[in-house]
Design a protein with these regions (language model features):
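N-terminal signal-anchor/first transmembrane alpha helix
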Residues: 1-39
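Short membrane-interfacial helix/loop motifs at transmembrane-helix boundaries
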Residues: 2-3, 31-74
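Transmembrane-helix boundary motif in ABC transporter permease subunits
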Residues: 2-11, 87-121, 134, 138, ...
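Hydrophobic alpha-helical elements at and bordering transmembrane segments
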Residues: 17, 37, 77-81, 85, ...
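Membrane-embedded alpha-helices of multi-pass transport/permease systems
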Residues: 30-34, 38-41, 93, 97-101, ...
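Loop-to-helix entry region at the N-terminal start of transmembrane alpha-helices
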Residues: 79-83, 139-164, 203-205, 210, ...
Length: 216
């Protein structure tokens, strides 16, 4: 965004310095992707920038690594990708349901101890991941779910629910509860009111939270 012409010099210096450092951080985060992506098309036995790749020779590029990941029988990448997608799918469903229900409860004006419950629900996001992971591992080992798909799904539900709670709660901030009371006065039951009125209105927050939970 351009600065007004009457902006003072010291503010201009600070503004452009700030933009420079923001660009530097952005470059630091994005640059590795521009290095890894070309390497994934390497035709050599080892992943590196070969002489043919640097010379832009078509023989230096190949889809062998993608083919090996998808169709390879001895490569564990295909199985790992499949397991990750399955776990992410079920964890997203669980996190979205729990997070949405929790956010609806927290949005009620009759809900006691809102701050305490909110802090408890988002604590997996605040606590360092190594601490959360260690605690979840020992708990899952105690109940016999360590190294199982069920245990991993439950663990990711715990870590993904806070994202849904935050996004749905933010959406419910501007929610007009008079529409639900109007639906109830016209004879609509709570389930029908939620499915036809509340859910469509908060759907952007639910979808955003689900996406965050999926990538978590």
């Amino acid at each position: 965004m351009a600065l007004p012409t009457h902006t003072q010099l010291n503010y201009r210096i600070w503004h452009y310095t700030y933009l420079f450092f923001c660009g530097l951080v952005f470059f630091f985060l994005i640059a590795p992707l521009f290095v890894i992506l070309p390497l994934s098309f390497n035709a050599e036995q080892y992943i590196h920038f070969s002489a043919k790749m640097l010379a832009l020779d078509p023989e230096g590029f190949s889809l062998r690594w993608y083919e090996d990941m998808i169709y390879g029988t001895k490569n564990p990448w295909g199985l790992a990708t499949k397991n990750s997608l399955i776990i992410a799918f079920f964890a997203t469903i669980g996190s979205t349901i729990l997070g949405t229900v929790a956010a609806l409860g927290l949005s009620s004006r009759y809900m006691p101890y809102k701050a305490a419950f909110m802090a408890l629900l988002i604590s997996p996001m605040i606590v360092p991941l190594i601490i959360s992971g260690t605690a979840i591992f020992f708990f899952m080992a105690k109940v016999g779910l360590a190294a199982t798909h069920t245990g991993i799904v439950l663990s990711h539900i715990i870590l993904g629910t806070p994202f849904v709670v935050i996004t749905v709660t933010a959406t419910l901030t501007g929610f007009d509860h008079s529409v639900t009371r109007a639906a109830a006065s016209l004879g609509s039951n709570p389930v029908n009111t939620f499915m036809k009125i509340t859910l469509p209105l908060i759907m952007p927050g639910v979808i955003s939270g689900a996406l965050f939970a999926f990538v978590t």
